[in-house]
From Swiss-Prot:
It comes from the Eukaryota. Pfam families: CNH, Pkinase. It catalyses: L-seryl-[protein] + ATP = O-phospho-L-seryl-[protein] + ADP + H(+); L-threonyl-[protein] + ATP = O-phospho-L-threonyl-[protein] + ADP + H(+). ATP binds at V27, G28, N29, G30, T31, Y32, G33, Q34, V35, K50. GO terms for molecular function: ATP binding; protein serine kinase activity; protein serine/threonine kinase activity. Residues 532-541 have a biased composition (Pro residues). This is Serine/threonine-protein kinase mig-15. The active site is at D151 (proton acceptor). Involved in cell migration and signal transduction. Important in several developmental processes including epidermal development, Q neuroblast migrations and muscle arm targeting. Required with ina-1/pat-3 to stabilize the commissural axons growth cone along a precise direction and are required for the cell to respond appropriately when signaling in the growth cone must change. During gonad morphogenesis, involved in distal tip cell (DTC) migration from the dorsal side of the hermaphrodite body to the midbody to allow for formation of gonad arms. Its EC number is 2.7.11.1. InterPro entries: CNH_dom, Kinase-like_dom_sf, Prot_kinase_dom, Protein_kinase_ATP_BS, Ser/Thr_kinase_AS, STE20_Ser-Thr_kinase. Residues 380-393 have a biased composition (Low complexity). Gene3D superfamilies: Phosphorylase Kinase, domain 1, Transferase(Phosphotransferase) domain 1.
């Protein structure tokens, strides 16, 4: 279509659909938007309504689709176009308005649905002939108008209630240039795509014409005959590579097909499109022309559909709710359990050029528009003058996306003065996902209403509160929190903490967001202002402020980068007594560093402030009178300074502001609080003094700040649970030393504390710390993976989750199934595992696991997912030994080692949302015990694997298998531990660890360093850590070495021999477990305190 023709379509002149059409439910996804079942308000006639967000980048494409529908939808085999509307959204500047395309509704679904609902996944031959004929008639109409559909497939061929066939989705249609008559753009869905269309992406000179639709018709006929298109088990990018290179597909002989059907398939599936007939010629083919009476076929199809019509919600498998975003990089990932639903697109329009180019480059080295998350539509009761529909965002929406929360106007003098946001005279707008009704649809409405009435309760209880304050004046002091308010407001007193009990977890993110908006105008206040403690007040009744944070749903976290895991900020009381909150949903409370509590104590309100630090572990339960809010520094340990109501590592020299008086003022009462905190801390984690005796580093030295006084301040209990460390200057050459740079070296020993430090010393230990979770597991712990801040644990009898964000509770998730290995991909909403008796590669949806946790807590619906499968197997693999997920740019490869082969899968984004086969290598001479994948010079893929005979490589281009290192011991088997692809080596340099040694080689087997890494003893586990170090767990010690040089950075000496197993790591946090002894296992984690880690 010419640009002048597009200019004739003025989107802004279209009418608003309010009062004309109403939405009923989501029925599918088009190229540029979701498709809804709708109803004409006056006539009740059903219609299909495609809703698209308008933006400048795709405005021309949308106009093109409208033009195509207007001109070419007047045919019996093309869905009729009724009209277009513009939905004006609240507060919209026009950039985010919605376009509604209203079309004929086809109530019997797509051809793909028909195939799925047919026994055996194969339609009758006469049905296939009828459907192919109707498709050809529709295509003939389009081709006569010089239009190529370019996305013919089962999902884009719909059936009406009377079994009429209609073509839909003109989003990728193209009008041919009247002179050339050919296109050279790359678009369509991979498995149905014609070879000449794929060639256009590889060669600018390649072209195609309308006959590319006939290849797609042939693939659709195979889909109807066999249940799926050819190569559908392959990754779509792999299919794009193979379609032009493989011979044309044919009908399989497992079913008796007529000769004319076979010749029809052979006629349309000709690779050279110049030899392919045109549409008019195919309409005269015997398979198309010689058919039974049309009414007979339509009647039989209709009867079949009516007989097999099922309620999708009851019988559907668990729908994938993942993300098209990349997994955050290991050094920049936000520990998040948030899950986002992405709608499934039905085609791969210019799908991920970067991704496609990356695959193409990898496979040949030797020779869009982001749709919103899937939304569930919920009808609201009739309201005066609104549109009769509402969007409801999916349950698994990331907190940072919840920008359309209800605006709460508190019933107070301040709120009354502000006035309503919109005047009553303003024109009412239909309710949408940008504007919700708190009275009817908001899940946190009761809690928000409680906040709104809080001022009234405060006034009525003022006298009672004053009396209680006088009575409590002589009782034990309570740790109080004061808001940072201007001087005129400092005389106001904070009333009792807001009591919120039995809050549903799914409501808490919304509630936290509302609290933040109530207090948003205070966030810009300088943190350097001192905060004077208010007079004592009685303890809260049943709950405290902590009930907001302690019960927060650990699943509603963001999948983004570290910025989404900022500190817990500014929970305070304003002068009117209103509880105020952060500017984003509250994160889980524990710190991965496990947790340094810091307070800057202001003494009795005078100008002199004393600095005191309390170093300890997460307090598992907030007792009345103690307000404890922890900062999660799991991914960012470099933040220093004092912020209101945050406990975090702090530099002693930092004096950016003062903290409230969080600790009692008298020494005696402060000791009581410290003892109470210590006792509660022991309920979650114990220091491992019984297991680890000393920590050494070569050529030890002492920090410049004197630590000798620390030793004398320890209690006997503290001293017993400390260990000794030596800091070595020689380790600096290894590049992986734990020593902080710039400190003088000394041979004196220093005391390293792993216990709560109550005497005000800053928590800046250079040596690693080890903590032990008190929970004992009866089964053998085989693997673990971090999911957000929490830990998924696989044992020989099930899967469970250790809630590190709360009180250390363990949630059982799956029982009676062995889990040997696991990896979490939060961006894809999956947990990949080797599990079960047959050792399958099984992928679990994190959102499904999250629902199990919510049901355990009584917060989730009991019927939410019980009838859905929350997992899927990868291929038909059995007997998996080891797998590795490797990221290359935006591609995620899954490499699986089996008993005699190695399989490679790649993650396919929407609409597939699964790992799909990429390549396979069978009949290996060595059993792969560990596997890995490297990309040499950003171009060549190589599989690396270790066996009892050494280490080997497979070149993906040539499929050549060769040895890269074979240990010298003849006749002896080796135990491979790990393969490390060294950083900054273009995927060429390796560290291969086996037995008690490690060697440096390149991917071609040549030694690169005349160095052999030598462990002090045979390790049971070896792992590469993100700090640039490699760790070995032996029976007598844990060694930490530089991965670049193999130099020893430090070693933990055990007090008694014990076998340990590495589980997982993130940044400088390392988790490992003890072997099953005495009937139970325990989990330890180590914080390496790597210098400069925050810059990694």
């Amino acid at each position: 279509m010419s640009s002048s023709g597009l200019d004739e379509i003025d989107l802004n002149s279209l009418r608003d659909p309010a009062g004309i059409f109403e939405l009923i439910e989501v029925v599918g996804n088009g190229t540029y938007g979701q498709v809804y079942k709708g109803r004409h308000v006056k006539t009740a006639q059903l219609a299909a309504i495609k809703i698209m967000n308008i933006n400048e980048d795709e405005e021309d494409e949308i106009k093109l689709e409208i033009n195509m529908l207007k001109k070419h939808s007047h045919h019996r085999n093309v869905a009729t176009y009724y009209g277009a509307f513009i939905k004006k959204l609240p507060s919209s500047t026009g950039k985010h308005d919605q376009l509604w395309l209203v079309m004929e509704f086809c109530g019997s679904g797509s051809i793909t649905d028909l195939v799925k609902n047919t026994k055996g996944g194969s339609l009758k031959e006469e049905w296939i002939a009828y459907i192919c004929r109707e498709i050809l008639r529709g295509l003939y109409h389009l081709h006569q108008s010089k239009v190529i559909h370019r996305d013919i497939k089962g999902q884009n061929v719909l059936l009406t209630d009377s079994a009429e066939v209609k073509l839909v989705d003109f989003g990728v249609s193209a009008q041919l240039d009247k002179t050339v008559g050919r296109r050279n753009t790359f678009i369509g869905t991979p498995y149905w795509m014609a070879p000449e269309v794929i060639a256009c992406d590889e060669s600018p000179e390649a072209t195609y014409d309308s006959r590319s639709d006939l290849w797609s018709l042939g693939i659709t006929a195979l889909e109807m005959a066999e249940g799926h298109p050819p190569l559908c088990d392959m990754h779509p990018m792999r299919a794009l590579f193979l379609i032009p290179r493989n011979p044309p597909p044919k009908l399989k002989r497992n079913k008796k097909w007529t000769k004319k059907f076979e010749t029809f398939i052979e006629t349309v599936l000709v690779k050279d499109y110049h030899q392919r007939p045109y549409t008019g010629a195919l309409l005269r083919h015997p398979f198309i022309k010689e058919q039974p009476h049309e009414q007979t076929i339509r009647h039989s199809i209709k009867e079949h559909i009516d007989r097999n019509r099922r309620v999708k919600k009851d019988d559907a498998d668990y729908e994938y709710s993942g993300s098209e975003d990349d997994e955050p990089s290991p050094n920049n990932r936000g520990p998040s359990m948030g899950i986002r639903d992405d709608s499934e697109s039905s085609s791969m329009i210019p799908m991920d050029n970067t991704l496609r180019k990356g695959f193409q480059k990898l496979q040949e080295s030797s020779r869009g528009f982001a749709e919103p998350g899937a939304q569930q539509l919920r009808r609201l009761p009739q309201q005066p003058a609104p549109a009769p529909f509402q969007y409801q965002q999916s349950r698994y929406v990331e907190p940072r996306r919840e920008s359309s929360e209800v605006k709460l106007r508190a019933v107070s003098s301040r709120g009354a003065a502000d006035g309503p946001r919109h005047s009553p005279a303003s024109r009412p707008r239909p309710v949408s996902h940008h504007q919700r009704s708190p009275q009817q649809s908001h899940p946190a409405a009761p809690h928000l209403a409680d906040l709104a009435n809080y001022e009234k309760r405060r006034r009525s209880e003022r006298e009672e509160r004053r009396e209680r304050e006088r009575q409590a004046h002589h009782a034990m002091p309570i740790a109080r929190v004061s808001a940072s308010v201007p001087a005129p407001q400092q005389s106001r007193k904070m009333s009792e903490p807001l009591l919120i009990t039995h809050v549903k977890p799914e409501d808490l993110d919304v509630l936290a967001s509302e609290l933040s908006k109530m207090g948003g105008h205070h966030n810009g206040r300088s943190r350097e202002e001192s905060m004077s403690p208010p007079p004592p007040a009685p303890p809260p009744r049943e709950a405290s402020i902590s009930s907001i944070t302690d019960t927060i749903d650990v699943g509603e976290l963001d999948n983004g980068a570290d910025a989404e895991w900022d500190d817990l900020k500014d929970i305070m009381m304003n002068g009117e007594g209103t509880l105020r909150g952060p500017n984003k949903p509250l994160p889980p409370t524990p710190t991965d560093g496990e947790n340094t509590l810091v307070s800057d104590v202001r003494r009795n309100g005078n100008g002199n402030s004393g600095h005191g630090a309390y170093k300890g572990k997460k307090i598992p339960e907030i007792r009345p009178g103690i307000i404890s809010l922890d900062d999660d520094d799991s991914d960012s340990d470099n933040e220093e300074g004092n912020e209101p109501l945050m406990f975090k590592p702090i530099n002693a020299s930092s004096s950016r502001g003062a903290l409230p008086d969080l600790l009692p003022k008298s020494p005696q009462l402060r000791r009581q609080i410290n003892d109470q905190t210590r006792q509660m801390s022991d309920d979650r984690a114990d220091e491992s003094a019984s297991l680890f005796g000393s920590f050494y580093q070569p050529n030890g030295f002492q920090n410049s700040d004197s630590r000798s006084s620390i030793q004398h301040s320890f209690s006997n209990r503290d001293r017993e649970k400390s260990f000794v460390g030596y800091f070595g200057g020689g380790a600096g050459a290894g590049g992986g030393t734990v020593n902080r740079p710039g400190r003088p070296q000394d041979i004196n020993q220093v005391q390293v504390n792993v216990t709560p430090n109550s005497n005000g010393t800053p928590a800046e230990n250079d040596a690693p710390e080890i903590r032990k979770y008190k929970k004992k597991f009866s089964g053998e712990i085989l693997c673990a993976a971090l999911w957000g801040v929490n830990l998924l644990i696989g044992t020989d009898s099930g899967l469970m989750l250790l809630d590190r964000s709360g009180q250390g509770k363990v949630y059982p998730l799956i029982s009676r199934r062995r889990f040997d290995q696991m990896t979490v991909l939060e961006g894809q909403n999956i947990l990949a595992t080797i599990s079960g008796r047959k050792r399958r590669i099984r992928v679990y949806y994190l959102s499904w696991l999250r629902q199990k946790i919510l049901r355990t807590e009584g917060a989730g619906s009991a019927n939410t997912t019980e009838k859905r499968n929350g997992w899927v197997n990868v291929g038909d693999l059995q007997g998996a030994i080891h797998f590795k997920i490797v990221r290359y740019e935006r591609i995620k490869f899954l490499v699986v080692g089996l008993e005699s082969s190695i399989e490679i899968y790649a993650w396919a984004p929407k609409p597939y949302h699964k790992f799909m086969s990429f390549k396979s290598f069978g009949s290996l001479s060595h059993v792969p015990l560990i596997v890995d994948l490297t990309v040499e010079d950003n171009a060549r893929l190589k599989v690396l694997y270790g066996s009892t005979g050494g280490f080997h490589a497979i070149d993906l281009d040539s499929a050549a298998v060769y040895d890269i290192y074979t240990p010298a011991q003849s006749g002896q088997t080796t135990t491979p531990h790990c393969i490390v692809v060294l950083p900054n080596s273009n995927g060429m340099q390796l560290l291969l660890c086996y037995d008690n040694e490690g060697v440096y080689v390149n991917t071609y087997g040549r030694m690169t360093k005349n160095v052999v890494l030598q462990w002090g003893e045979m390790p049971s586990s070896v792992a590469y850590i993100s700090t640039g170090q490699i760790m070995g767990w032996g029976n007598k010690a844990i060694e930490i070495r530089s991965v670049d040089t193999g130099h020893l950075d430090g070693v933990f000496m055990h007090k008694k021999a014990q076998k340990l197993k590495f589980l997982c790591e993130r940044n400088d946090k390392v988790f490992f477990s003890s072997a099953k002894g005495g009937g139970s296992c325990q989990i330890y984690f180590m914080t390496l305190n790597k210098p400069g880690l925050t810059n990694w």
